[in-house]
Amino acid sequence: MVYSSCESKEPDSVSASNHLLLNGNDELVEKSHKTGPENNLYSQYEEKVRPCIDLIDSLRALGVEQDLALPAIAVIGDQSSGKSSVLEALSGVALPRGSGIVTRCPLVLKLKKLVNEEDEWKGKVSYRDSEIELSDASQVEKEVSAAQIAIAGEGVGISHELISLEVSSPHVPDLTLIDLPGITRVAVGNQPYDIEYQIKSLIKKYICKQETINLVVVPCNVDIATTEALRMAQEVDPEGDRTIGILTKPDLVDKGTEDKIVDVARNLVFHLKKGYMIVKCRGQQDIQEQLSLAKALQKEQAFFENHAHFRDLLEEGRATIPCLAERLTSELIMHICKTLPLLENQIKESHQKITEELQKYGSDIPEDESGKMFFLIDKIDAFNSDITALIQGEELVVEYECRLFTKMRNEFCRWSAVVEKNFKNGYDAICKQIQLFENQYRGRELPGFVNYKTFETIIKKQVSVLEEPAVDMLHTVTDLVRLAFTDVSETNFNEFFNLHRTAKSKIEDIKLEQEKEAETSIRLHFQMEQIVYCQDQVYRGALQKVREKEAEEEKNRKSNQYFLSSPAPSSDPSIAEIFQHLIAYHQEVGKRISSHIPLIIQFFILRTFGQQLQKSMLQLLQNKDQYDWLLRERSDTSDKRKFLKERLMRLTQARRRLAKFPG
């Protein structure tokens, strides 16, 4: 790691006696000489630091960040704020430089400290499916630029796609940073007109996450209140709980304003809970003079040591790149340890959710014919099982939904009410009909004798009125069953559009066939009802009850609801007698029609319809030439399944790695 005199303020630091400088492939200015207890403490530190960072880096490499936010340090700043210089100083490698937008893709900078001083520098640039191994720090700038062009294209466009730069060296800190494009306010040249919006959207995507520490780079020679990067950080982190300010270019401060910069660095002006650090990196003149990063660190150390105002910040541990490196590593480790339990729960919940979602899309379709046959058998078997559940009234329903049988029973209850209402509402008309028939058709019978023809004619007319309502109920229930069967097809075959279409076609064909048979049976029943018949003992019992009820009402001088508008029974004994017979027969025929019509509908429209559909679906297995056609998926189904499987695999691997983590 990088150490400096800032460590003198922290005697318990494992690096208190070290003065390693970050310098890429340059030689060390001062080498550490760790002995005894210090060396043991350093080893313990390395044992804790590296596994934490490696864990998060490995999760990021798995792509877990596509599903969940991971602990990270995001580096943001306005253009020309010195952001690139800070990253160069930390990593020891030169990153793409130039005017305008240089960072055009988020760059994950993974710094790994090698234990042995003799270990050679190595690097790796990864993006999409490409991995470029680097053996020299001088290759970094070129390869990162090439990666940006490959992702974002030539020009000045930006992309949300990540580039990973891994640097392993004895002279870098254990740290992972995400470098984001510099904020620009005005589009210049051939930049997109909305470049400011694009960049800010990309930055917000990272800094808004609670798992991200925001490293805001601010030049000392500008008014901190006008800094866009700090304003954006404040929007997503109003309390400054996860924001660290990095003050750059202290050598460009106007004379007489140094005290103001010291106040800012001491967190007295624009308060952040994590405070500020101040660094001096290579300027443009240093770069032109080819000042090495190692020499730049020496120059920075000397600058703060000799500066009348800023030397106090150095003594307080608030200044220089080495102090910043140590601070960032410490912050990242604490942040990782703090967020790991939450991350573990999030991964567990996401894993469960994706597993459930993946079940909806089923398994992959086998390639071989035998496998396809068994796959189709399973699909049709599941469909037929659901149809059986519907027939038996045992299907599973979600909250607030009714079973099919419940909906049918409701229709049957309405039918029973229609039958009862038909007879009750007809009593007024019946009285008039009885009088009409008596006046027109009574033959040589004396008054008081019941005319059976009158009774029979009225009964037939009353029953025939119910035929069309019965057929209407048949159509209503048929639609309910058809919709229920279609829903089962959609549930089981939704991803296989040809299979679903075939099932729907069969449902429609069988529905028409069974509906026709049911209607024929219903109309036949009403034809049979034109034969006035009831078992003698049943009819006698019904007639006796009607007479007893009438006698009781007469005795109590109360009018039954049925006789509110009818003439008094005593006014015409013949009419009263026929009326009693009509009521008795209505009661029995009403019971018969109320029960038998629903029975016909259940038999043809539910049971036979379902059974015929099941047989018809099984017949699909006989035509092997159609397997491919029937099992053709929707265009997005296989892609969605593949996407979910990849997510599930990532999260499964993430859970395993978290389980193995010693922390």
UniProtKB/Swiss-Prot annotation:
Residues 248-251 are annotated as: G4 motif. Residues 102-104 are annotated as: G2 motif. Residues 551-570 are annotated as: Disordered. Induction: By type I and type III interferons. PROSITE patterns: G_DYNAMIN_1, G_DYNAMIN_2, GED. Residues 367-534 are annotated as: Middle domain. The modification N-acetylmethionine is found at M1. Residues 342-367 are annotated as: Bundle signaling element (BSE). The keyword Protein transport does not apply. Residues 77-84 are annotated as: G1 motif. Residues 179-182 are annotated as: G3 motif. ISGylated. Residues 368-633 are annotated as: Stalk. It is a peripheral membrane protein. Keywords: Acetylation, Antiviral defense, Cytoplasm, Endoplasmic reticulum, GTP-binding, Immunity, Innate immunity, Membrane, Nucleotide-binding, Ubl conjugation. Its main location: cytoplasm. Belongs to the TRAFAC class dynamin-like GTPase superfamily. Dynamin/Fzo/YdjA family. Interferon-induced dynamin-like GTPase with antiviral activity against influenza A virus, (IAV). Inhibits IAV replication by decreasing or delaying NP synthesis and by blocking endocytic traffic of incoming virus particles. Homooligomer. Oligomerizes into multimeric filamentous or ring-like structures by virtue of its stalk domain. Oligomerization is critical for GTPase activity, protein stability, and recognition of viral target structures. Interacts with TRPC1, TRPC3, TRPC4, TRPC5, TRPC6 and TRPC7. Interacts with HSPA5. Interacts with TUBB/TUBB5. Interacts with DDX39A and DDX39B. This is Interferon-induced GTP-binding protein Mx1. The gene is MX1.
